[in-house]
Regions:
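Active-site-flanking segments in enzyme catalytic domains
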Residues: 3-19, 23-267
Length: 267
């Protein structure tokens, strides 16, 4: 039913679908079945590839998984149309045409596998649902990447990470570093249950390095946590090319890596 290669084309397809005069509940159900099947197939392939906790993809599959995760089924035809209309409108506000930057997913897959080998990241940090890492194939009006959390009634969670194409002026930071930053948000959510907070012991640990973090800059602590996770992991042998914090002493980066390793090990 869908003929799409990125999030922008997904929005356009939804708008065309919603404009149809004879749109039926059966057609909408068929669309949902299609994207749900895509998620099942992607999850099965991840199991075969020995990384059941995360799915990394681009193109049509990424767009269909975005729709599947952000579309909550239920209700009559008008209820379904309203949900899809709200989603399409939000996409119109957030996403803009591609900047012709191709995101190479191979280094990102290597990072995920390294974290699993070194820290059992998938088993200890991720929720029961797979982490979706989706290359949007378009740009966002404000961000190069986003971590989208889902908190469920039983206090469990899952996350998606969206990667957006950037303008040429914004290419200074590697995609590996950007992914590590977003994974820092995922770890923070696992530790605190609140992506807008940071662990109390992180505030005391990081205060000597970032004076005022626990007081004046406390609201920025979650971003500092994600930065510190990224720079800690990037201090490891073989991952130095993802280091976006060249002005910080390597010994300090390694201290933060040790802190993050200990937090993961305790989970």
């Amino acid at each position: 039913m869908l003929s799409i290669n990125n999030f922008i084309e997904l929005k356009e397809n939804l708008e065309i679908l919603l404009a149809e005069q004879n749109l039926s509940h059966e057609l909408i159900s068929g669309l949902h079945d299609q994207v749900e099947h895509t998620l099942i197939m992607a999850a099965n392939e991840a199991i075969i590839d020995r990384h059941p906790g995360w799915i990394l993809c681009e193109g049509r599959r990424a767009a269909e998984l975005y729709l599947c995760r952000n579309w909550r089924r239920g209700g009559q035809l008008e209820d379904e149309k309203t949900r899809l209309r709200v989603l399409a409108e939000q996409m119109r506000k957030d996403f803009i045409a591609a900047q012709n930057e191709r995101i190479d997913l191979r280094p990102l897959e290597r990072i995920m596998r390294d974290l699993d080998e070194q820290n059992h990241f998938t088993a200890k940090v991720l929720g029961e649902e797979p982490l979706l890492i989706l290359s949007a194939g378009c740009s966002h009006r404000c961000f190069s990447a986003l971590c989208r959390p889902y908190i469920y009634q039983d206090d469990s969670f899952s996350c998606d990470i969206y990667l957006f194409q950037r303008t040429a002026e914004d290419h200074g930071t590697s995609w590996g570093s950007i992914l590590l930053h977003e994974l820092g948000h995922v770890l923070n959510l696992r530790l605190t249950g609140d992506i807008s907070a940071a662990p109390d012991d992180f505030l005391s640990f990081a205060e000597p390095f970032f004076p005022g973090l626990s007081t004046k800059y406390r609201t920025s602590a979650p971003e500092f946590f994600a930065h510190c996770f990224a720079m800690g992991v990037a201090s490891r042998p073989g991952l130095e090319r993802y280091d976006a914090f060249l002005n910080i002493q390597n010994e300090h980066k390694q201290l933060f890596d040790a802190y993050m390793r200990s937090k993961i090990a305790q989970l």
